[in-house]
Amino acid sequence: MANGIIVIDKPQEWTSMDVCAKIRGVLHERRVGHAGTLDPMATGVLPVFCGGASKAVDLQLDHTKTYCARLRLGMQTDTGDITGTVLETAPVTAGEKELLAVLPRFLGPQMQTPPMYSAVKINGQPLYKLAREGVTVERKARPIEILDIRYGGSPVENEYVLTVRCSKGTYIRTLLEDIAAAMGQKGTMSALRRTTAGVYTEADAHTLEEIQAAKDAGPEALQALMLPVESVFESLPLLVAEPRVEQHLYNGCPTSRYPAADGRYRVRNAEGQFLGLANITGGVLKVEKLFVERN
């Protein structure tokens, strides 16, 4: 049984759910989920949680993501990227100097309004479905944070490369449109690649072709591409549970007078097997989530 995290280097034109469907077929495992949607035009790091590890998707500690994006000046589209319909074109009257001048304004906590072409739901309906019907609705701005933004040059005229490290829920398309507006320009996103997602980086990622080749080579080759679910929680302190405490965790029973500081822990048993997460409050140890699958 496949249990773990496969980090995929998502290709262009695939949706994040397309990737999950592919992995379900490869693993013959229905419990597959991804951590952080990438638009079809985007490429890069997409962590896919498989088997029992799928329970960790909503428990990730680090939601920070890093993107390499291209801003194209002189046009604006309905989707905020070059896959959309061009709404307006305009002469480009600003460049690198103006871009560098406005970038510091976008650092730090801020409110961002999700674009109409997004998976955000209004009354149970995804915004992108409404947008495809020509319907525009009011959206509430949401808190995000831009932790770092760096200029990476201009590979072609009127296009600028930016590397952005940001919080969960940040729409890079919207950020680039806002940056262009601050420059007094129209702008859209011409390319996007995610280089990190939480603790996972491009170095962890595998192409779908590599996944298929591993499947063809056999179960051991496929398992070798998986990262353990414990990798999600590596920043938490480690607690090693003795057999009595391990049994308490399995049974959902608290352990009183536990000799450790209050806090959240990742837990292994005496044999080094990762069991799950636990919390200690006032000397009482309680299980939060188990990931070990017992036969």
Give the role of each language-model region.
Residues 1-167, 174-206:
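Catalytic cores of RNA-modifying enzymes
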Residues 1-9, 13, 17-34, 38, ...:
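Accessory RNA 3′-end/elbow-binding domains used by RNA modification enzymes
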